[in-house]
């Protein structure tokens, strides 16, 4: 591995002891350092952090359409990392019955449509609680976000039908 730091952090260390005292098996790997350095350059050159904030706001706005689904209990997140919580009852936030394995059904149906989701069950005290995460690429376009939401809407309709909603 390598440590990637801003110029401010580097200058602070350089003005002090000049030593960054840390060690791991792969510390100081020149390839890892070069990759980290290039990644930071690309983030800066492409203004990708600001872009992620802007596109994250757009994603959040488009995700709001999913609140019309009877099983969508909450939508939350920051930037391009967004999560959707699925519930049996929107008012009480009672989780879906774990025996439904909703998160597995959601994952499989999404894959059939070419949509990659991170889904999980047992999010509430390790027993119940189904959720999914979206984390599109930093370079995602508005049209792609719209396509993702359209596919996700179709997937949810299909899975809701399978479980009787």
Place the predicted regions along the sequence by residue:
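Conserved N-terminal phosphate-binding loop of PLP-dependent enzymes in the Aspartate aminotransferase
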Residues: 1-165
């Amino acid at each position: 591995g390598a440590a990637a730091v801003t110029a401010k952090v580097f200058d602070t260390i350089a003005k002090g002891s000049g030593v960054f005292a840390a060690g791991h098996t792969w510390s100081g790997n020149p390839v890892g350092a070069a990759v980290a350095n290039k990644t930071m350059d690309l983030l800066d050159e492409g203004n990708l952090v600001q872009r992620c904030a802007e596109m994250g706001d757009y994603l959040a706005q488009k995700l709001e359409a999913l609140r019309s689904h009877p099983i969508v209990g909450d939508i939350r997140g920051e930037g391009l990392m967004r999560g959707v919580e699925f519930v049996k009852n929107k008012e009480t936030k009672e989780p879906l019955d774990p025996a439904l394995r909703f998160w597995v059904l959601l994952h499989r149906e999404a894959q059939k449509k070419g949509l990659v989701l991170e889904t999980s069950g047992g999010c509430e005290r390790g027993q119940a609680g189904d959720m999914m995460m979206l984390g599109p690429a930093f370079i995602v376009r508005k049209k792609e976000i719209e396509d993702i939401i359209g596919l996700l809407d179709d997937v949810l309709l299909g899975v809701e039908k399978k479980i009787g909603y």
